[in-house]
Curated annotation (Swiss-Prot):
Interacts with human UCKL1. Interacts with host CTPB1; this interaction seems important for EBNA3-mediated transcriptional repression. Interacts with host RBPJ. Interacts with host USP12 and WDR48; these interactions form a deubiquitination-competent complex. This is Epstein-Barr nuclear antigen 3. Residues 396-405 have a biased composition (Basic and acidic residues). Residues 351-364 have a biased composition (Acidic residues).
Length: 925
């Protein structure tokens, strides 16, 4: 176990260690990023270095392959990997500085090495982006190579023991970031690419061994390197779109760098005609990046074929010359077609030849359908709800389900669907009602008064879309040639809907009562079932009497009974039946006539005809569940006539003085007559904060101007001392008890109090005094320490958690949040934590009081009392990556500032039977 653990941190951390990566070693000075050197060694030295790190028990034990054909007697000859011709280490070290093109060539050479061949299993030709290829290759390559070596002594390894909090990915990981310039056209500004390589292991095990490898840090690109990367990108796009028989020649040219060597040693006899076509394309191409690629690979732009003169055979030379001419003639189009691999080969493809063979057979050949093909329609599980219902109703038979699915209309995805016409149910003739909301089952209507019975009246359906006016929907009015219903007595006078009475009034005027003409029928008491009463118990109404009554306030209580259950109640007056509408109109007419004849002198009830003041929202915010504004809304929207005055019991414990009536009563019931001061009346409303003259609470909105000055004693909360005399303009000091751990300054009010318009009289700072704080003589800011307070502090349940909204500073520590503390292997805690910053919760520059130091034990038995700064004004913005903006031509928009792109790669090191050489050595007991 001790061998797998990292050593102590290095004393000098300025020199960052980058482990060797199979022949590629990066040396970067701190000030010069352009001159970076490379060391390339042959594969023999690499194998010797690996054997040196193997354990003694593993040395000298190499498995030998047995030839099956020879019966196990003769071992098979091991074919070594192809060796690349590179000059000596000293020549490359002093003659060739590391540029990105040689760096990528080293990666290509590493792919042929036995130990680094696993790179091909992670990615192949799918990545045409050069910088992504570099990042992925070097991250995986270093992880494979460095897991066999001793862990480097780096201080950052202490922080590498991390585990994600996600339940679905129990991985240990370490991310390392760097940046480089991207490849681009010379006319476009270079883009900065942020590279991030993340190394991880399963379940966070053996993290020190897995994370002991360094991370690839690419060198900064020079202008020549960016030009070369641009060429490689364009050539890579061409290779991806070319036929595989031609695209392999691009790799041969980039690796071997000689046409003669490719012709003699690499290309097979069957590929020579195709290779000649490829050379013909290179001779006549006009693409600039293809010419640059040939120049980088061969060192010249001329394409020569010296092997043509060495072969005197006439037939072979003619075939090669014909292929060269075809490449010149077709150009780039030749790379996208199927090549001719022989002299007598035809131009038809494999698919065409298979079609010609199948045409000769009369019998139909079996066809195998692949599941990976293009889906022309969605699977049955993704069918629409209508189709699924049809399939479910079809029964268990598969044939019936298929027939039902075939009959279902097929539409492409995204096309609008026509509205589904619902079948209109048949209304039985026995019922004399007709509703506009057709239902499948019409229950028996409740018993009604004989006056409401309409004899010999045919069913009259009311139009639902669009909704016609109420006058057009009444029976006896023919429309569009439809049969008229039986004649009924017409109403005299205009028809006024109660829910539209408020719309007829101007916004600045009060409601004008509408009194229709009396109906030519005998007044019959209308039962309550004919009215549209709310199902839930409606809130009570408030009524006050004038000063002439013998008793101050008359209190009564009415119990609201829920309306009897009616099947499928109408949603709006236009959807009611004709009988219910007629009964409702008669009841409303009688109610209005009764209210016009008997007009009270004082305010006795709340009705839609009474003027109501706005806004009603403040009362709802001040008193949760307050019924003041709901009464007017219910009376106005539902159109229920006010038959009798409604009262309810409201205990009052505070006087409503002559100068300022109660805000909720005034907002919902209009003007209130003055109340004599000799008979004080009280009401009790639970409040949690005082509303003083200096600053009103945030949830009290400005009301309409009230008669007389505002007296602070009227808004005293429960438990406060009441003033014996009511004097306008005099405000007394008010105190309340809250468990606070920090005083509030006199010079700055609390944060949750909003600014109000100036009021009469100077603002007294003593209005915001708290218990235990001595009053000040002036308006200066006074600081009070906790030691001077006479009451004990509140016991904190958890350090760092405020106990009152008045506390405007918070204190956090590592122990308060339960953060994990890194410990090294010796059991001592590593002092890698940075000091905490101060959190400033001040608003608009107001002074922040000194925070008390809560005794929070930190590391080493010391108190962690640093204050965290939470202010958002004037703080430096964190560095956030910016995404590049592409113009209309598809290229990046040119800016003076370089753009940034975040590129992240996650490399998961798998330790299983597939990579036995990657597994860690067994732990020693």
């Amino acid at each position: 176990m001790d061998k797998d653990r990292p050593g102590l941190p290095a004393p000098d951390d300025n020199i960052e260690e980058v482990p060797s990566t199979s022949g590629v070693q990066e040396r970067a000075s701190e000030g010069d990023w352009e001159n970076v050197l490379i060391e390339i060694s042959d594969s023999s030295s690499e194998e010797e270095a690996e054997d040196a790190h193997l354990e003694p028990s593993q040395r000298g034990k190499k498995r030998k392959r047995v030839d099956d054909d020879a019966g196990g007697s003769a071992p098979a000859q091991h074919v070594p990997p192809p060796q690349l011709d590179h000059p000596g280490r000293e020549a490359i070290l002093y003659r060739f500085p590391l540029d990105l093109r040689r760096f990528i060539q080293a990666i290509g050479a590493a792919a042929t090495h036995p130990d680094t061949r696993a790179i091909d299993q992670f990615f192949g030709s799918q990545i045409s982006n050069t910088d992504l290829y570099v990042m992925y290759a070097m991250a995986i390559r270093q992880a494979i190579r460095d897991r066999r070596r001793n862990p480097a002594s780096r201080r950052s390894q202490v922080k590498w023991r991390m585990t994600t909090l996600a339940a679905g990915w129990p991985m240990g990981y370490q991310a390392y970031s760097s940046w480089m310039y991207s490849y681009t056209d010379p006319q476009v500004t270079a883009t900065i690419i942020h590279l991030q390589a993340t190394l991880g292991c399963a379940s966070g095990r053996r993290c020190h061994v897995t994370f002991s490898a360094g991370t690839f840090r690419p060198p900064r690109c020079s202008p020549g390197d960016r030009q070369w990367l641009y060429v490689q990108s364009r050539v890579g796009d061409l290779v991806q779109s070319s036929n595989p028989c031609y695209s392999i020649f691009f790799d041969y040219m980039a690796i071997h760098r000689s046409l003669t060597k490719i012709w003699d040693e690499v290309v097979t006899p069957d590929q020579r005609v195709t290779f000649m076509e490829f050379l013909g394309f290179l001779q006549r191409t006009e693409l600039v990046y293809i010419k640059s690629f040939v120049s980088y690979a061969l060192g010249t732009t001329s394409i020569e074929t010296p092997w043509m003169d060495e072969n005197p055979s006439t037939e072979t030379a003619q075939a090669w010359n014909a292929g060269l001419l075809r490449g010149r003639a077709y150009g780039q189009d030749l790379l996208r077609t199927e090549g001719e691999h022989g002299e007598g080969a035809t131009c038809e493809t494999r698919e065409e030849s298979e079609d010609t063979e199948s045409d000769g057979d009369d019998e139909e050949l079996p066809r195998v359908v692949s599941r990976d093909g293009t889906k022309h329609r969605r699977p049955p599980i993704f069918l629409r709800r209508l189709h699924r219902l049809l399939l479910m109703r079809a029964g268990k038979g598969k044939e019936r389900a298929r027939e039902t699915l075939a009959k279902a209309p097929r539409r492409t995805y995204g096309t609008p669907r026509p509205p589904v016409q619902k079948p209109r149910p048949e209304v039985p003739q026995s019922y004399e009602t007709a509703t506009s909301h057709g239902s499948a089952q019409v229950p028996e209507p409740p018993p009604t008064h004989p006056l409401h019975q309409q004899h010999s009246m045919a069913p009259c359906m009311v139009a639902q879309n669009p909704r016609a006016p109420l006058g057009d929907q009444l029976p006896g009015v023919p429309k569009d040639g439809r049969g008229a219903c039986a004649p009924v007595p017409a109403l005299a006078g205009p028809i006024v809907r109660p829910w539209e009475s408020s719309l007829l009034q101007s916004p600045g005027r009060a409601f004008a009562p509408v009194s229709p003409q009396p109906m030519p029928v005998e007044p019959v008491p209308v039962p309550t079932v004919a009215l549209e009463r709310p199902v839930c118990p409606a809130p009570p109404e408030i009524a006050m009497q004038g000063p002439g009554e013998p008793s101050g306030i008359k209190r009564t209580r009415e119990r609201w009974r829920p309306a009897p259950w009616t099947p499928n109640p109408p949603r709006s007056p236009s959807q009611m039946s004709v009988r219910d509408r007629l009964a409702r109109l008669r009841a409303e007419a009688q109610a209005r006539q009764a209210s016009v004849e008997v007009q009270p002198t004082q305010l006795t009830q709340v009705s839609p005809q009474q003027p109501m003041e706005r806004p009603l929202e403040p009362e709802q915010q001040m008193f949760p569940g307050s019924p003041f504004s709901q009464v007017a809304d219910v009376a106005r929207e539902s159109g229920v006539p006010a038959m009798q005055p409604q009262y309810f019991d409201l205990p009052l414990t505070q006087p409503i003085s002559q100068g300022a009536p109660a805000a909720p009563l005034r907002a919902s019931m209009g003007p209130v007559p003055p109340v004599p001061a000799t008979q004080p009346q009280y009401f009790d409303i639970p409040l949690t904060e005082p509303i003083n003259q200096g600053a009103s609470a945030a949830h009290f909105l400005p009301q309409q101007p009230m008669e007389g000055p505002l007296v602070p004693e009227r808004w005293m909360f429960q438990g406060a001392t009441l003033s014996q005399s009511v004097r306008p303009g005099v405000a007394q000091s008010q105190y309340f008890d809250l468990p606070l751990t920090q005083p509030i300054n006199h010079g700055a009010p609390a944060a949750h109090f909003l600014h109000q318009p100036p009021m009469e009289g100077p603002w007294v700072p003593e209005q915001w005094m708290f218990q235990g704080a001595p009053p000040s003589q002036g308006t200066d800011v006074v600081q009070h320490q906790l030691d001077d307070l006479g009451y004990p502090l509140h016991d904190l349940n958890h350090p760092g958690v405020p106990v009152s909204p008045a506390v405007n500073q918070y204190h956090f520590s590592q122990a308060a949040f339960g953060l994990p503390i890194d410990e090294d292997e010796s059991g001592e805690r590593s002092d890698t934590s940075e000091p905490y910053e101060a959190l400033d919760l001040s608003i608009h520059g107001r002074p922040c009081p000194q925070a008390p130091e809560w005794p929070v034990q930190g590391e080493g038995g010391q108190d962690a009392t640093e204050v965290l700064d939470l202010s958002i004004h004037g703080r430096p913005r964190p560095r956030t990556p910016e995404w590049p903006v592409q113009g209309e031509s598809g290229q990046n928009v040119t800016d003076h500032e370089p753009r940034r792109v975040v590129v992240s790669a996650i490399v998961h090191m798998c330790q299983d039977d597939e990579f036995p050489d990657l597994q860690d050595p067994p732990d020693e007991a």
